[in-house]
C-alpha cells in the first residue's frame, strides 16, 4: 500500500522556500561568527559566544589599533563582519515577510493562539499542511511527520530520548 500524499500549492512551496532560505542564512551567519571567533582566539583574544555581543566585541577589537590582530587580516575580518550584518538584515526581512503571512492566514492565527507555538512553527506548519491536518490518523502521526518526535540516543541496552529532532518534512 502506498500512502497518498497531499500536493503542496504554489503558495505553500513559496512559504516553505522562505523557511529554507532563512535556515540557510542562519547557518551562513553562524559559520561566519564562528570563523571570526576562531581567528580572534588564534591571536589570543577571547570573545564570548553569542551573535550580537560577539560581533560587537570583535568590531571593537578590530577598531583598536593596539589590539593583537595583525593589520594584514583586519580588513578581511571587517568584511566578514559586514557579511554577518548582511545576513542578519536578510534574516530580519524574511521574518517580516513571515509575520505578514501569519497576519493574513487564519490557520496561522489559530496556531499562534496555542501556547508554545510561535511565528516560525505556525508558518512552517501552514507551509507543510496548509492548515489542514485531517488526513493524519491522529496527533501522534502528525507530530512524527512534522518532526516533533524526540531524538533517540541508544547504546547497548540503554535507550535515551533527547530533544525533538525537528527533522520532519525533508
Regions found by a protein language model. Give the residues of each.
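Short, polar/flexible loop-turn hinges at active-site or ligand-entry regions and domain interfaces
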Residues: 1-12
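Phosphate-backbone recognition surface of nucleic-acid-processing proteins
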Residues: 110-170
Amino acid at each position: 500500500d502506498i500512502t497518498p500524499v497531499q500536493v503542496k500549492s504554489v503558495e505553500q512551496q513559496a512559504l516553505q522556500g522562505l523557511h529554507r532560505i532563512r535556515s540557510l542564512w542562519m547557518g551562513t551567519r553562524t559559520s561566519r561568527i564562528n570563523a571570526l571567533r576562531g581567528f580572534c582566539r588564534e591571536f589570543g583574544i577571547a570573545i564570548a559566544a553569542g551573535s550580537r555581543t560577539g560581533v560587537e566585541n570583535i568590531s571593537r577589537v578590530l577598531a583598536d589599533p593596539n589590539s593583537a590582530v595583525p593589520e594584514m587580516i583586519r580588513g578581511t575580518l571587517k568584511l566578514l563582519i559586514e557579511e554577518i550584518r548582511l545576513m542578519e538584515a536578510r534574516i530580519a526581512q524574511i521574518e517580516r515577510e513571515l509575520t505578514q503571512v501569519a497576519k493574513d492566514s487564519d490557520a496561522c492565527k489559530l496556531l499562534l493562539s496555542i501556547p508554545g507555538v510561535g511565528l516560525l512553527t505556525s508558518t512552517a506548519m501552514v507551509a507543510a499542511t496548509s492548515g489542514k491536518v485531517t488526513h493524519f490518523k491522529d496527533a501522534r502521526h502528525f507530530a512524527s511527520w512534522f518532526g516533533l518526535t524526540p531524538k533517540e540516543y541508544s547504546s547497548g541496552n540503554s535507550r535515551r530520548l533527547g530533544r525533538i529532532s525537528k527533522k520532519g518534512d525533508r
